A protein has these predicted regions:
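Switch/coupling sub-region of P-loop NTPases
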Residues: 115-136
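Conserved, mostly hydrophobic/aromatic
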Residues: 21, 40, 60, 121, ...
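Single conserved hydrophobic/aromatic residue that forms the stacking wall/gate
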Residues: 1-7, 11-12
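Short acidic/polar active-site loop segments enriched in Thr and Asp
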Residues: 17-19, 135
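Active-site beta-loop-alpha junctions enriched in small/polar residues
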Residues: 24-26, 72-76, 142-144, 195-197, ...
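Aromatic- and acidic-residue-enriched carbohydrate-binding clefts of CAZyme catalytic domains
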Residues: 25-63, 77-116, 124, 143-168, ...
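Conserved alpha/beta catalytic core and glycan-binding cleft of carbohydrate-active enzymes
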Residues: 133-135, 150-259
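Hydrophobic beta-strand scaffold residues
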Residues: 64-67, 190
């Protein structure tokens, strides 16, 4: 409750329009900050459970602050209490080192070919929107969903039917999910955290987009924070950090954030 009051008051004071929460679905692995999801339909006990989170969202809405939550549909952990070997086999995915630069992250990538997997993930997203009145879903790790060779070494991955490295099943899942959320007509939106430069994340002037509402502009965030961290005496030669984003601004529907 104190978090609700303090958080909403701070947002009003600093004139924020939305807040984005780190993953609130239950997890065990503290090192991954909640991105190795254990329970896709359960609020983590760290914030007090379901009722406490509903109170937090309601307080934000009453203060005129929209609520966005991070959601991970790219991979899950190997904890025995979670989805790993759920039925004694690979019910939800298959093992792959999807984050090669962090070999200690033992994760399983979802197999989007399976109808049960697509239904499970879509049901999870809709549950957060319906039951907790979340305004927006930020999909984390979209790049790792889009590429079959993400984080893999040559010779350790299998190309798609066309010989490419695109994960065609994941692409179709993302399109279906975004279209389903858009059809709700209640203003809910999706944000892609996509770092590979994939063309066509949003519908802005793209022929075959993934249909995300927005793409998070991580480059702008990095440049802006670097500029603000520069001593004012030396900012004269750093203004290009504030204007560079206009070179690609109209290629996607970007969202600017300090996340």
């Amino acid at each position: 409750i104190r978090l609700s009051l303090v958080g909403s008051e701070m947002c009003i004071r600093d004139r924020y329009t939305h807040v984005c929460f780190l993953p609130v679905a239950e997890y065990l692995n503290e090192e991954m900050n909640g991105y190795s999801t254990l329970g896709y339909f359960a609020v983590t006990h760290r914030i007090g459970g379901s009722d406490a989170f509903k109170k937090l969202v309601d307080d934000c809405h009453n203060a005129g602050i929209g609520v966005i939550m991070d959601w991970n549909g790219a991979y899950f952990g190997t904890e025995a209490k979670g989805l790993y070997d759920f039925d004694g086999a690979d019910a939800y995915g298959y093992l792959k080192p999807s984050l090669e630069k962090h070999p200690e992250w033992d994760v399983v990538t979802f197999d989007y070919k399976k109808g049960a997997v697509r239904s499970f993930l879509l049901s999870s997203v809709l549950m957060w929107l319906n039951d907790y009145h979340i305004d927006g879903i930020r999909i984390d790790g979209v790049a790792s969903m889009l590429y079959l060779d993400y984080g893999k070494q040559p010779g350790t991955w299998t190309p798609n039917m066309y010989g490419g490295n695109e994960n065609l099943d994941a692409i179709e899942f993302l399109k279906t999910m975004n279209k389903c959320i858009a059809k709700r007509g209640d203003g809910c939106f999706t944000i892609a955290e996509e770092s590979s430069g994939w063309f066509g994340v949003t519908a802005a002037d793209n022929d075959d987009p993934l249909m995300f509402t927005y793409k998070q502009n991580n480059c702008w965030t990095k440049d802006f924070l670097e500029f603000m961290g520069t001593d004012p005496l030396f900012r004269k030669g750093e203004y290009d950090k504030l204007t560079y984003g206009m070179l690609y601004n109209y290629g996607e529907d970007f969202m600017l954030s300090l996340n």
